[in-house]
């Protein structure tokens, strides 16, 4: 028997607005049972369980055995350990200093390949002797019965299988990490398990939400949505005539934006390779010359004309017809059907106008904005793409071609889409997730993004716009006169790319303090760098990032495209590193970061035009992954320093490259100093952790305010 404890908890499950909520921060949820045992040579020894809250058991089992096991254990092993550790801490248990999550192990060993990482999926994929017994409980959950109410014997059998499967999975992972080709992953694994403890701290602390401020933001967004919809409707009437258009329909937006409609959807999908393959991946667009593309567009779609509505004579504009019941009578042995004056309850849809109440007659004038798709990648099931990225590209095209109506429509359509997301996801998410005590406990995910970056849900703060986003005003301090303090890495992805490539000019620019994002915005906006605003700098970061990942500026305005070419001339070391990455990946399919994280592309090939398949991922993943590991190391250090200082201030969020702290008014300077120390001096700890010495310095910007929106920059003088 070892000092490694394998554990699985079963809990009750509440529902909030129809959504499953098994959070330990829901006051109505409880631990139903704990199942645990000591790791043996090939299984669990001394398996035990304790039932604390079940309908069949009137008296709760003692917590003594679990407390003693947790006190004795050196390592706690769970699958999705963040869930179990959070529950244990909220229930008043102490946990071992070292946590091992088998979900993290499977995630890292997958090396960015899509694999089922659940306990059941992992056990089945590996062919483990022990298997998760989901079939025992699935039908109970489908019927709305959770662990509290389902038969106790069923739950106990299911949970024991979970513990034994987790133990066997752990042992299999230890063998995998021992293999020479996987040894580098051990460093990344250990850091991710430490980061798990930091995320538990964040989630437990939660964010204070000002619901009154959130209501105000919601009203502002709803008013803006009404205004945008009204103006877009006016433009639609201007360019489409009387044709009815749904702004949320991809088919209708193809008509408005591209002035075309699909003739036959089946033929359209076949022509443009729209759909997924057997592996669930999107099919690649067909290769076509420009002439072939133009011919295919004409073959699969037709030009849309403006229409004029004429009242339907069959239904008089109602769109439906009132029919009357018919009775059968017999006279002289013959049956007669006689219409009565009794109407049917529901009116019948008019076949002549399709229920529209009008006939839409073409006027002969081309409708829509007449934007032109430029290649097969524009094709979509409903015609041609009108997604966020495509709309932004089309706005640039319309601007260059001086189409003011198209620019206005596309800009407002993009904004309407954003506002709808803000309302449906962010505002509604905050309202739904905020507990009665005014605290929101977000959920952070380590094993979703292939790169190693964190994602979050309830809410997805990683997708919030960084500056000027009104929803941020609702996130406030829980302390009287407290501040929300945010420390953000300055230009982290550029610095990471320079670090990995060891580009000499990039290093010189960083050491001189050149603001790369400001330089980029000045070129894109064709204005002096000193005249670039903060929002403009933020809004043009994409142009700084794209060359880092092999972007060429194709399809963009000439002066922006020229910037991309100039970038590679200036930073030749980055271009050389890109070439070496792709050459190396063609040889062995692997890219590895200094932190030990690996990415694997088993099917990488050189394509026509001397390009490399998966090139964007090959160039993107190591920058994102190493950046993620640096941020995570900073988070681990911040938690360590907070605990050493016994601060009242709370670590509450990490978003992108920043750490956010709910700061007690008496601890502002102390928190500022700790964050600077934790974030700017990660290079010292990277030497001991990764055996890697950085040449690039990492700087932070710190701001503070009463809420997360209204922030003022703080001076870093004497911050360390």
Language-model-detected regions and their locations in the chain:
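Function-dense linear segments that define catalytic or interfacial modules
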Residues: 443-529
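Active-site-proximal helix-loop-helix substrate-binding element of RNase H-like nuclease domains
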Residues: 29, 40-178, 276, 518-525, ...
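Polymerase palm active-site segment centered on the conserved acidic dipeptide of motif C
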Residues: 205, 216-251, 563-581, 666-720
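Conserved catalytic palm subdomain of right-hand nucleotidyl-transferase polymerases, strongest
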Residues: 6-7, 78-79, 100-103, 478-492, ...
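Short active-site loop/helix that positions an aromatic residue
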Residues: 82-93, 105-110, 253-262, 490-505, ...
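Conserved catalytic core of nucleic-acid polymerases
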Residues: 197-200, 204, 307-327, 335-337, ...
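Conserved "right-hand" nucleotidyltransferase catalytic core of DNA-directed polymerases
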Residues: 1-10, 15, 33, 45, ...
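Short acidic, Gly/Ser-rich segments with clustered Asp/Glu that frequently serve as metal-coordination loops
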Residues: 9-17, 489-496
């Amino acid at each position: 028997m070892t000092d490694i404890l394998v554990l699985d908890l079963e809990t009750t499950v509440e529902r909030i607005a129809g959504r499953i909520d098994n959070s330990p921060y829901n006051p109505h949820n409880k631990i139903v049972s704990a199942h645990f045992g000591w790791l043996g040579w090939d299984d669990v020894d001394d398996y035990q369980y304790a039932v604390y809250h079940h309908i069949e058991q009137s008296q709760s089992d003692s917590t003594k055995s679990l407390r003693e096991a947790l006190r004795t254990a050196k390592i706690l092993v769970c699958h999705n350990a963040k869930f179990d550790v959070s529950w244990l801490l909220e229930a008043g248990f102490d946990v071992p200093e070292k946590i091992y999550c088998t979900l993290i192990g499977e995630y890292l060993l997958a090396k960015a390949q899509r694999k089922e990482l659940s306990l059941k999926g992992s056990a089945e994929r590996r062919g483990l002797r022990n298997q998760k017994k989901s079939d025992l409980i699935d039908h109970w959950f489908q019927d709305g019965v959770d662990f509290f109410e389902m038969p106790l014997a069923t739950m106990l059998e299911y949970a024991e299988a979970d513990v034994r499967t987790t133990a066997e999975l752990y042992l299999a992972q230890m063998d995998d990490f021992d293999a020479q080709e996987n040894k580098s992953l051990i460093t990344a694994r250990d850091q991710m398990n430490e980061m798990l403890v930091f995320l538990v701290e964040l989630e437990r602390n939660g964010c204070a939400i000002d619901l009154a401020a959130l209501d105000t933001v919601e009203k502002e967004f709803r008013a803006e949505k009404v205004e945008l919809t009204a103006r877009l409707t006016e433009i639609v009437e201007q360019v489409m005539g009387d044709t009815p258009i749904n702004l949320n329909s991809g088919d209708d937006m193809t008509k408005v934006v591209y002035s075309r409609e699909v003739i036959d959807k089946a033929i359209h999908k076949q022509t443009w390779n729209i759909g997924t393959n057997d592996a669930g991946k999107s099919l690649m667009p067909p290769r076509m010359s420009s002439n072939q593309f133009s011919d295919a567009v004409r073959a699969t779609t037709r030009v849309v004309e403006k229409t004029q509505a004429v009242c339907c004579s069959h239904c008089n504009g109602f769109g439906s017809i009132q029919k009357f019941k018919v009775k059968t009578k017999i006279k002289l042995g013959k049956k007669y059907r006689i219409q009565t004056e009794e109407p049917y309850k529901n009116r019948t849809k008019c076949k002549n106008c399709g229920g529209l109440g009008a006939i839409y007659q073409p006027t002969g004038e081309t409708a829509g904005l007449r934007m032109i798709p430029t290649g097969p990648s524009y094709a979509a099931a409903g015609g041609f793409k009108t997604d966020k990225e495509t709309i932004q590209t089309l706005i640039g095209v319309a601007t260059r071609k001086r189409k003011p109506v198209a620019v206005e429509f596309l800009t407002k359509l993009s904004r309407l889409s954003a506002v709808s997301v803000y309302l449906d996801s962010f505002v509604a998410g905050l309202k739904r997730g905020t507990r009665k005590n005014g605290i929101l406990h977000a959920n952070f995910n380590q094993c979703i993004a292939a790169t190693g970056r964190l994602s979050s849900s309830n809410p997805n703060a990683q997708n919030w716009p960084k500056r000027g986003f009104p929803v941020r005003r609702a996130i406030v301090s829980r302390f009287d006169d407290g501040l929300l303090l945010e420390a953000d890495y300055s230009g982290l992805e550029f610095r990471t790319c320079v670090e990995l490539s060891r580009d000499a000019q990039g290093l010189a620019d960083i050491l001189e303090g050149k603001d790369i994002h400001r330089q980029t915005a000045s070129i894109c906006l064709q204005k002096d760098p000193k005249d670039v605003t903060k929002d403009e700098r933020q809004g043009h970061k994409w142009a700084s990032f794209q060359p880092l990942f092999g972007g060429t500026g194709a399809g963009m305005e000439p002066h922006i495209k020229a910037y991309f070419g100039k970038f590679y001339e200036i930073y030749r070391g980055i271009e050389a590193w890109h070439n070496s990455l792709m050459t190396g990946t063609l040889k062995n399919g692997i890219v590895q970061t200094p932190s030990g994280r690996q990415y694997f592309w088993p099917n990488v090939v050189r394509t026509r035009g001397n390009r490399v398949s998966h090139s964007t991922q090959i160039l993107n993943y190591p920058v994102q992954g190493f950046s993620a590991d640096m941020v995570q190391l900073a988070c681990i250090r911040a938690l360590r320093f907070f605990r050493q200082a016994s601060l009242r201030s709370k670590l509450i969020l990490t978003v992108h490259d920043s750490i956010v702290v709910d700061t007690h008014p008496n601890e502002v300077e102390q928190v500022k100093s700790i964050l600077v120390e934790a974030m700017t001096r990660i290079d010292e700890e990277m030497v001991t952790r990764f055996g890697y010495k950085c040449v690039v310095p990492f700087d932070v910007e710190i701001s503070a305010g009463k809420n997360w929106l209204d922030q003022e920059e703080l001076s870093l003088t004497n911050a360390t």
